[in-house]
């Protein structure tokens, strides 16, 4: 539905027995297949951003499925990527980063098994609230060149589609 974050949710929907009601999920607006189509069939994802592909082409079977679902992939919009959500923000180490609230660099990001970061040209991993540790590295960006850094609070807010005028108070870990 256009959010630059992979989120899995469970919905419980109920109605009183005396009410004649029907419910269905909203019609999807975006799809992973449409993003893959733009990356690997037309190349428009990379071209529109002035980039060379930063990921491996999917295996032949996956590519065939993407091509065979062409009609569906043209109807739905591509998933919004982490890159798309933060592309107009400067690197948090650049002096111009101070122009954006809560856009402060945090040192120390590093990958280890099971702690891999979010791929820049995919939607972000689900960001979790709280100071419970970060087992999957979802608060890190995995750059195509093999480097990593933590998302700033502002970048995390962008991924969750908070407006830029929202001010977050407290320590970075809160």
Predicted regions and their residues:
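Class I S-adenosyl-L-methionine
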Residues: 1-120
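C-terminal target-recognition/interaction regions appended to catalytic cores
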Residues: 80-174
């Amino acid at each position: 539905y256009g959010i630059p974050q992979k989120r899995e949710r469970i919905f419980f929907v109920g109605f009183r027995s005396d009410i004649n009601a029907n419910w269905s999920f909203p019609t999807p607006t975006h799809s992973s297949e449409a993003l893959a189509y733009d990356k690997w069939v037309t190349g428009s994802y990379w071209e529109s951003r002035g980039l060379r592909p930063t990921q491996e082409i999917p295996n032949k079977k996956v590519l065939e499925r993407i091509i065979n679902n062409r009609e569906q992939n043209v109807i739905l919009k591509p998933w919004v990527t982490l890159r798309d959500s933060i592309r107009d923000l400067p690197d948090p180490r650049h002096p111009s980063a101070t122009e954006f609230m809560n856009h402060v660099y945090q040192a120390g990001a590093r990958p280890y098994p099971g702690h891999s970061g979010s791929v820049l040209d995919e939607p972000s991993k689900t960001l979790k609230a709280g100071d419970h540790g970060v087992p999957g590295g979802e608060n890190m960006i995995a750059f195509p060149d093999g480097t990593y850094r933590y998302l700033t609070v502002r970048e995390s807010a962008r991924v969750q589609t908070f407006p830029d005028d929202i001010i977050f108070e407290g320590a970075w870990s809160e």
